[in-house]
From Swiss-Prot:
Residues 910-921 are annotated as: Interpropeller linker. Oligomeric Apaf-1 mediates the cytochrome c-dependent autocatalytic activation of pro-caspase-9 (Apaf-3), leading to the activation of caspase-3 and apoptosis. This activation requires ATP. Isoform 6 is less effective in inducing apoptosis. PROSITE patterns: CARD, WD_REPEATS_1, WD_REPEATS_2, WD_REPEATS_REGION. Keywords: Apoptosis, ATP-binding, Calcium, Cytoplasm, Nucleotide-binding, Repeat, WD repeat. It is found in: Cytoplasm. The lineage of its organism: Eukaryota, Metazoa, Chordata, Craniata, Vertebrata. InterPro entries: Apaf-1, APAF1_C, APAF1_CARD_dom, APAF1_WHD, Apaf_helical, CARD, DEATH-like_dom_sf, G-protein_beta_WD-40_rep. Residues 104-415 form the NB-ARC domain. It comes from Homo sapiens. This is Apoptotic protease-activating factor 1. Physiological concentrations of calcium ions negatively affect the assembly of apoptosome by inhibiting nucleotide exchange in the monomeric form. Monomer. Oligomerizes to a heptameric ring, known as the apoptosome, upon binding of cytochrome c and dATP. Oligomeric Apaf-1 and pro-caspase-9 bind to each other via their respective NH2-terminal CARD domains and consecutively mature caspase-9 is released from the complex. Pro-caspase-3 is recruited into the Apaf-1-pro-caspase-9 complex via interaction with pro-caspase-9. Interacts with APIP. Interacts (via CARD and NACHT domains) with NAIP/BIRC1 (via NACHT domain). Interacts with CIAO2A. The gene is APAF1. Its main location: cytoplasm.
Amino acid sequence: MDAKARNCLLQHREALEKDIKTSYIMDHMISDGFLTISEEEKVRNEPTQQQRAAMLIKMILKKDNDSYVSFYNALLHEGYKDLAALLHDGIPVVSSSSGKDSVSGITSYVRTVLCEGGVPQRPVVFVTRKKLVNAIQQKLSKLKGEPGWVTIHGMAGCGKSVLAAEAVRDHSLLEGCFPGGVHWVSVGKQDKSGLLMKLQNLCTRLDQDESFSQRLPLNIEEAKDRLRILMLRKHPRSLLILDDVWDSWVLKAFDSQCQILLTTRDKSVTDSVMGPKYVVPVESSLGKEKGLEILSLFVNMKKADLPEQAHSIIKECKGSPLVVSLIGALLRDFPNRWEYYLKQLQNKQFKRIRKSSSYDYEALDEAMSISVEMLREDIKDYYTDLSILQKDVKVPTKVLCILWDMETEEVEDILQEFVNKSLLFCDRNGKSFRYYLHDLQVDFLTEKNCSQLQDLHKKIITQFQRYHQPHTLSPDQEDCMYWYNFLAYHMASAKMHKELCALMFSLDWIKAKTELVGPAHLIHEFVEYRHILDEKDCAVSENFQEFLSLNGHLLGRQPFPNIVQLGLCEPETSEVYQQAKLQAKQEVDNGMLYLEWINKKNITNLSRLVVRPHTDAVYHACFSEDGQRIASCGADKTLQVFKAETGEKLLEIKAHEDEVLCCAFSTDDRFIATCSVDKKVKIWNSMTGELVHTYDEHSEQVNCCHFTNSSHHLLLATGSSDCFLKLWDLNQKECRNTMFGHTNSVNHCRFSPDDKLLASCSADGTLKLWDATSANERKSINVKQFFLNLEDPQEDMEVIVKCCSWSADGARIMVAAKNKIFLFDIHTSGLLGEIHTGHHSTIQYCDFSPQNHLAVVALSQYCVELWNTDSRSKVADCRGHLSWVHGVMFSPDGSSFLTSSDDQTIRLWETKKVCKNSAVMLKQEVDVVFQENEVMVLAVDHIRRLQLINGRTGQIDYLTEAQVSCCCLSPHLQYIAFGDENGAIEILELVNNRIFQSRFQHKKTVWHIQFTADEKTLISSSDDAEIQVWNWQLDKCIFLRGHQETVKDFRLLKNSRLLSWSFDGTVKVWNIITGNKEKDFVCHQGTVLSCDISHDATKFSSTSADKTAKIWSFDLLLPLHELRGHNGCVRCSAFSVDSTLLATGDDNGEIRIWNVSNGELLHLCAPLSEEGAATHGGWVTDLCFSPDGKMLISAGGYIKWWNVVTGESSQTFYTNGTNLKKIHVSPDFKTYVTVDNLGILYILQTLE
């Protein structure tokens, strides 16, 4: 019975005994089921009415709450209202079916049982841990009334005792499993006399009426026997709770064949006892939300109102209940010390985090130290060795085998003792064991052993060197990943600077590590240990860091590129190049193929860092306000956050159910907003990646998001294809304001620097300015009007205003639409200036530099431009991306900017470096002549000038400034010819610069041009479906007419014959002297994309957009073989020199090698593809066999060499750009020339 009810009954006992008549009262109680017939008989046997009443009340006092209520109701029913009123205040809350009352969830029965059993009350500040409590209750219920053990184990301060008490605070558990009650014993660390005292006290408590013995047991054995008898006879089906058991010999004393729940740091204590055993491990962390809940209760604040330091405290201590409670109790007394206690945690000053509390220890270091001190002397030093481990790092057993020079079994036995005592944790993944320390244990060890740390790190390096060489670590070794990640850390911590430099400046180490973990961690280490590496050689350190930064997008891909070949592309002064050259020469002797880029000194790489965080297009990327981090989002539906300096990944979040279109950091960098095609806007914690809010009030995809520039009152603006802008207050669950006015999709929005205005851009052709406070429209500028022709205004013209950017002073706004940028005055709405970027691309994005008058502009034609907005002149071209550039953004200080692209990469550029560069870019229309040791390249540059480049010396002659569309060199380098966009053809004599111009002009752009071997005749083809044969010395011209559509290309044959192929699906053979068409082959239903002629001149091949290739004889009008199997357009083909093989390449990056005689497929050469990446980097556009037929070279997104015998790749050369159109190969197959889509010329030579 509840104490209150019992007291009330005792207080009014005299009045009740005087007045009540028991017979009618007992009838009611019998009918309620709370009094038995035998009890009624016992009452009736009393001689007087008062004695009968006294006997009834004595019986009720021994019963439960329900009996009290039944007695109260009987009094009311029989007219004793005054007496019932006396008992009214003592009426207990009767338990419901669940056994819980409405106030605390605990019945009076539970309270009474726990109070009598000495179970501790809940702490002053208490949060539930339902999952763990349920797990303990499930294990207890498994005992089913039989003797057994349930062990709760975990490290110091993880809340084991609180959980044990909470588990038995349950009505149904006590009533169903332990009706005999519970008995709590706080055991702790005991000697024999202390243990005897504990047992004596327990026996006394269990035998209060001294019915078994009137004296205390004199020794432990007697006490054990006494306990067994008491539990069996007086307290059957009761639960004995032993709190904080340290030793197995102590536990033996309580082994009395009863049901026992115990808490311990050492789960092996039950090894010495018999009976069923169940274990409940307790994690050392409460979890972030529970931790914050405890702090909020201590300081009496809402969880949402807690300062940022609260989150950091939970993060630092990993949610340790002991630490959170200690700090919470301290903060209750000193509520302004958040920063102070956080610093003490960060600086590992555990002694200063001290507070008397319900815990057994007043300070964190006490709780941990006692566990360590209790270790056996022979293993204490091994625990000290763990001081060198880093937080959150799981260490394979093999690492510690090397450290201690022991067999695996010996090491596992030692570590298991640490695990059993909750001093170490073990992650068992199949057969392999990995061990780790709690963060607080790491901090405790490093503080305790700080004077030994350098020697401990030196010890592990010395042991590593005995067992391993860094570059010989194999991925199948259990410990290899640990060494790749932490070898440099141990060397730096051991102050082994010489060894660290040797490691970090080794191309072998770079290769081995990047192949397994990618480049970001290595870049991080170069930054982390820069002060050490620079002491050795600053330039070398920069060489390696730049190499990793600029090749990061390649080094993170599969198949892993040949790092020696990448190293050969570095400047010749670079240490990376020198090591690569040395290694390549050794490997060439063993038959390996390597290429030297002999004209690379003319190339300047403008990117500072290239990262590839996504597996699909990157739609947006932005800097954090402190410039230290970059967030990016894209078509792979993820949000990525990485370090701006190294590209090291910090967060990867599966953010939305569809493509993520935009992301933005808040001004205080605490949050990141994302918006998506799935119509949702989400707010994330930028440090942890936790979802903070989800807003879904837009009815169409959300295109943009932007935070206010001040964190004083943080607002988020979003724009959607539903034509609306919305403002969101992060403290509210719903939209704060909706802005109506646009009549088409809102593409972009930006707050002004002072946050008073919000600018928005729309597909309706307008820029609108809104009052950020009232959400009213202030101004609207019709950008569309600037594109309308005054003479013929096309009102239905679509002008999409893509984006806008404010100047730093907020006086001007830059707006992008189509291929133009407009600058408007904010106050007058007047047009200040206009920038025209060119006809061939549209502007995707633009951004104002925060410091000066620079604007960065992203274009659809893969490039980025920098413009001076005052002079309206282009300052720089930045080429490097391989596809559309979707986003650009300056860093907060303007020193760098980032670009994000469809090619899955984000590039960082240094503003000053880019502005100083004025590199000339080439068009891909080039011709090459290999003459003895010379390589002469005729090329058209980006401003349509003609250049003659000596590939060996790099000398450039600028020949003409005509609008050249194609060009060629004569075989003996005496003449050059070029055609233009208007159809005109000219020949330039190189000796005297004399020009010969054809009187016979093509009607459309000239695309192909070639001299005959005697240099007297020039052949050209154009979009006009004609081929022109011009004997320029006699000024005579023959037109080859017969194709119905554009001539794709042509090839000269022997005996004045010419082979041509066309979009009309035919291949034709012409006599170029007479102009007669000699043969007409109807080859394909689709466009004929390429042809090649066998070296014996008896056959030719044709490939087509219909996904087939065919082999033809010049003597037959039907094909010899039709080659099927390609799944894309077959774009190129090539015969081997002996005419026995034919190679074909398609738009899926697949190459097939066929037997010419029977048409059988011999090899399928398809490079392995990453998810989202085309094989061969795109279309295969050109192929060429080596003279001996053993090797094949292919051009596509990059250049590959193949072993024809095996069909396997021999080497890959990654060009800076992509989409190579043609590869020019020297007759000896040792020199190769091509131009990528960035306009970079590559003259490659086989390394010998």
